[in-house]
UniProtKB/Swiss-Prot annotation:
<comment type="function">
    <text>Probably deamidates glutamine residues to glutamate on methyl-accepting chemotaxis receptors (MCPs), playing an important role in chemotaxis.</text>
</comment>
<comment type="similarity">
    <text>Belongs to the CheD family.</text>
</comment>
<dbReference type="Pfam" id="PF03975">
    <property type="entry name" value="CheD"/>
</dbReference>
<protein>
    <recommendedName>
        <fullName>Probable chemoreceptor glutamine deamidase CheD</fullName>
        <ecNumber>3.5.1.44</ecNumber>
    </recommendedName>
</protein>
<dbReference type="InterPro" id="IPR011324">
    <property type="entry name" value="Cytotoxic_necrot_fac-like_cat"/>
</dbReference>
<dbReference type="InterPro" id="IPR005659">
    <property type="entry name" value="Chemorcpt_Glu_NH3ase_CheD"/>
</dbReference>
<keyword id="KW-0145">Chemotaxis</keyword>
<dbReference type="GO" id="GO:0050568">
    <property type="term" value="F:protein-glutamine glutaminase activity"/>
</dbReference>
<dbReference type="GO" id="GO:0006935">
    <property type="term" value="P:chemotaxis"/>
</dbReference>
<dbReference type="InterPro" id="IPR038592">
    <property type="entry name" value="CheD-like_sf"/>
</dbReference>
<keyword id="KW-0378">Hydrolase</keyword>
């Protein structure tokens, strides 16, 4: 399975509230720590984040997916927006980092009905049902969950010791943050696509301009009239 390199979260920052380095997880991204004492944070509306870790090694990670599953026959299903692919990627990256599959445990969050369009399609509820069903099938125990409801959530996950702090948010606040996060993601992808598709430009040294110098003509004075 090949994973797009830009699916790995890359927004590192220092959180002055928690006094530690952190990584922001945007929609369709994931991040895996290798025992570092990092904080992973995200904002969830109808999306779901699965926080997985190996408690023995402290290796852990988080994903952030938007939809439960896609058409298995479609190439678009193999993207991080779909839960099935996002879970597979997260588990595989944890194992590559040194986690043991039989020690993995999970905490899952999100799936809120925060937008009217999402409520009609039950996207949040379907996301929550999917992640619980997936983890049960994979024999990964769920140690904590906060799914559903009409609230959005801000998640702070500490993979090293397994702590998760959840803050419920007013729907209009969450909507604004998700819009910003989505715009950031689109902007980053557009910039990357532009850099890949930009035509090759050969650069040459600028030619030296030839400047001819002439003697400045003498100014005529009133006394020099003929």
């Amino acid at each position: 399975m090949s994973v797009r390199l830009d699916a790995r979260a890359s927004r590192h920052y220092y959180d002055s509230t928690f006094e530690r380095h952190a990584v922001k997880i945007l929609p369709n991204e994931y991040f895996v720590t290798k025992g570092e004492d990092l904080m992973l944070s995200t904002v969830l509306g109808s999306c779901v984040a699965a926080c997985l870790r190996d408690p023995l090694t402290g290796i852990g990670g988080m994903n952030h997916f938007m939809l439960p599953d896609g058409d298995a026959q479609s190439p678009a299903s193999a993207t991080m927006r779909y839960g099935a692919f996002a879970m597979e990627v997260l588990i595989n990256e944890l194992l590559k980092a040194g986690a043991a599959r039989d020690r993995l445990e999970a905490k899952v969050f999100g799936g809120g009905a925060v937008l009217s369009a999402m409520q009609q399609m039950n996207i949040g509820e379907r996301n929550g049902q999917f992640v619980l069903s997936y983890l049960k099938t994979e024999n990964i125990p769920v140690r904590a969950q906060d799914l559903g409801d009409t609230h959005a959530r801000r998640i702070h996950y500490f993979p090293f010791d397994g702590r998760v702090l959840v803050r419920k948010m007013a729907p209009h606040h969450a909507k604004a943050e998700e819009v910003i996060a989505h715009r950031e993601k689109l902007a980053a992808q557009k910039a990357q696509d532009n850099s890949r598709s930009a035509p090759r430009i050969e650069r040459f040294d600028a030619p030296k301009m030839k400047v001819e110098m002439f003697k400045r003509p003498l100014r005529r004075t009133a006394n020099a009239e003929s």
